[in-house]
Design a protein with these regions (language model features):
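Flexible coil/turn residues that form the inter-helical turn or adjacent wing/linker of helix-turn-helix
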Residues: 170, 375, 426
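Accessory DNA-binding and partner-docking regions appended to nucleic-acid-acting proteins
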Residues: 1-7, 93, 361, 391-473
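Helicase motor core with emphasis on the C-terminal RecA-like subdomain
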Residues: 5-14, 18, 22, 26-38, ...
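Short alpha-helical "packing" element that flanks the helix-turn-helix/winged-helix DNA-binding module
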Residues: 24-27, 368, 413-420
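C-terminal accessory regions
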Residues: 364-389, 397
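Short coil/turn segments at secondary-structure boundaries
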Residues: 22-23, 379-386, 430-436, 449
Length: 473
């Protein structure tokens, strides 16, 4: 086939697809017409095609800013696989030798390279800025744009320097893309990238094929996980743990129980990490047990379950990680284990960080706890968090809708909670408020004399989990 004449022909010619998904065509047209373009699209919606196709069709080199070396490598390999020459796409980062960098620059100068993937750190290097000023650029793509926002779940300070650097290189259209952005994060991204007038394309964040469930974390969690895996014989799944040690221990436990599982975390040597990732992609193992270092840019469409061993640090992170299930449209089970103890542990980890970071971290954690303890439809809660309305009363595909929790009258406990907070002059955390209400004679409560308050022990007989839920709400 000769060079494609229109977008549909180009889509078929380069990617083999017969039609665009969702907003893809309108997004590409917006960018090719020279408009700044902001894309909010859930995981699996086809974000990368929104900048890859125009990059192949437009004159010059597109600068694609991406946070992870592994992510860049995967995307460059994928583009080279559909192109006649490897020179069409390159990445520029700290893993390259001087000779390799010189070759990349030569290919760009010779007009062969349509896509250059760079980490923000590489983009800000003086010699790279100088070089990029001398080449024709088609547009800039900022992938994983939520990294710009302090309110995002994966804030990276170097992302804040992108706009000033773009201004130094050359003014061209910018496309910013993310799979997770609350209205607050969206505003922050647009402000920081100077994209207030950008054309906004927002796809629905609803993933109807995903089943959401939150379980109380108990002493038999490892056995429960084995049962979940055995319910999906020969199928792929991801288990997320917060600590590297837990990743190693759980992977070993699953192996001992004759399950095909491998660990993945940033502390492993890169060769083992890559080998384990490839084994998962090539279906030589069924389960990958990982920290959140795993998954960004991993395109495995048939993941059937995602388990969170620990409650995630934010709902954005939860949405992105669960979003790795069922990308082929088939079923995806998302099961999260939750305990108030985990929450306290995570709050402790935050101590020692800058105050503003602690405050944001605690707020994000609070939102996650509210989600876990809520009796409302999980889908409704999640979509509301991302600024989207869900009008159905029952989604039929979450634990709260399939087995509605018994409604309990909480008016008296709520009044007692407000009275306790008032008696403590609004100066103490939820855990302390609960201890006062339960009548616990801790050293702090005695030191402050709060065991003499009228409200001390006012909810001594109330179930602790119920009290937690009321205080959080």
């Amino acid at each position: 086939m000769s060079n494609p004449k229109n977008l549909h022909e180009a889509l078929k010619y380069y990617f083999g697809f017969d039609k665009f998904k969702g907003n893809q065509e309108a997004i590409i047209e917006s960018l090719m017409e020279g408009h700044d373009t902001f894309v909010l699209m859930p995981t699996g919606g086809g974000k990368s095609l929104c900048y890859q196709l125009p990059a192949l069709l437009m004159e010059g080199t597109a600068i694609i800013i991406s946070p992870l070396i592994a992510l860049m490598k995967n995307q460059v390999d994928a583009i080279r696989n559909i192109s006649e020459s490897d020179r069409v796409a390159h990445f520029l980062n700290s893993s390259l030798t001087k000779a390799a960098i010189d070759q990349v620059k030569q290919d760009i100068l010779d007009g062969y390279t349509r896509m250059l993937y760079v980490a923000p750190e590489s983009l800000t290097k003086e010699e790279n800025v100088e070089f990029l000023r001398s080449v024709p650029i088609s547009f800039y793509a900022v992938d994983e744009a939520h990294c710009i926002s302090e309110w995002g779940h994966d804030f990276r300070p170097e992302y804040r320097r992108i706009r000033p650097i773009i201004n130094e290189i050359s003014q061209k259209p910018v496309i910013a893309l993310t799979a997770t952005a609350t209205p607050k994060v969206q505003h922050d991204i647009q402000k920081n990238l100077g994209m207030q007038d950008a054309r906004l394309f927002k796809s629905s964040f609803n993933r109807p094929n995903l089943y959401y469930e939150v379980r109380q974390k108990g002493p038999n969690i490892d056995r429960e996980i084995i049962k979940i895996i055995k319910d999906h014989p020969g199928q792929s799944g991801i288990i997320y743990c917060l600590s590297r040690k837990k990743v190693e221990d759980l992977a070993e436990f699953l192996q001992v129980n004759d399950l095909r599982a491998l660990p993945y975390h940033a502390g492993m040597d890169s060769a083992t990490r890559s080998a384990n990732q490839d084994a998962f992609l090539m279906e030589q193992t069924d389960v990958i047990v990982a920290t959140i270092a795993f998954g960004m840019g991993i395109d495995k469409p048939d993941v059937r379950f995602v388990i969170h061993y620990d409650i995630p640090k934010s709902l954005e992170g939860y949405y992105q990680e669960t979003g790795r299930a069922g990308r082929d449209g088939g079923e995806g089970r998302c099961i999260t284990f939750y305990s108030a103890k985990d929450l306290q542990k995570m709050e402790k980890f935050m101590q020692g960080k800058p105050i503003s970071e602690q405050e944001i971290g605690k707020q994000l954690l609070q939102d996650t706890a509210n989600y876990a303890e809520s009796s409302v439809c999980r889908r409704k809660t999640l979509l509301f968090y991302f600024g989207e309305e869900y009008t159905q009363d029952n989604c039929g595909n979450c634990d709260n809708c399939r087995s509605p929790k018994k409604q309990v009258e909480a008016k008296d406990t709520l009044c007692a909670t407000l009275e306790t907070i008032e008696a403590l002059k609004e100066k103490f955390k939820a855990e302390y408020v609960k201890d006062v209400m339960k009548g616990k004679e801790t050293s702090d409560i005695k030191a402050y004399g709060h065991d003499d308050l009228e409200v001390f022990g006012c909810e001594a007989s109330t179930d602790e989990r119920f009290l937690n839920a009321v205080i959080r709400q």
